[in-house]
Amino acid sequence: MLLKKAPAYRKAEKEDFSMIREFIRRNYKDRWEFEETHTEKRLTRLFFYTYMIYRDSVTVATYRDQVVGVLITGKESHGHFAPIFRLKKGYHFLRLKFTKEGRKNLEHFNKLQDMKKQLTVSPEKPTPGNILFLYVSKDYRRNGIGTGLLKQISTEKDTDYSIYMDQLDQRTFMESHGFVKKNEVSQMRELNKKRFRESVAFYKKEPHCETHS
């Protein structure tokens, strides 16, 4: 869809949370393995509450009062106290542990976390901020919304951001915005009875890199 006017950008509000959860579901549904809809719902909420605990900022793109994109930044090693979010995350984690589908997806989630740890930059130069989640609704892509979201953090903070990306993420898009792959690891995975090599790469953007439109 070609937009007739430029989208607006602002900090997320509580009323946006349901749409952000929907974006998380859309982004990850092809990476999870499930037959029961409650498994998908619990995984979505587990990821959402995890992002809320570790967030620095949550920026949304809106078009005609509709949320069409979101960018969440934060530090996975420095979470907020956030007792309500932590309680809800723990609840959905336990519900997933009680089912075979849930345990299988949690096992894969833990493997991905281990892969990320292998890619972590040296402790002598830690990365100040991570992009935890970036998503633009498919109907509104190719309108510069992803670029606009990245510009929000480039103007708000003078820092170098990093992002972990797997083979289903838009790596070419991030590379066009100055992100450079620093390292990559892979492992074999079975999803829906198909085996494939899953990879996770660590991308980093140096400060003052220009953002392409």
State each model region's role:
Residues T147, Q167-L191:
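Conserved active-site alpha-helix within GNAT-family acetyltransferase domains
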Residues P128-G129, E156-L168:
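Conserved GNAT acetyl-CoA-binding A-motif
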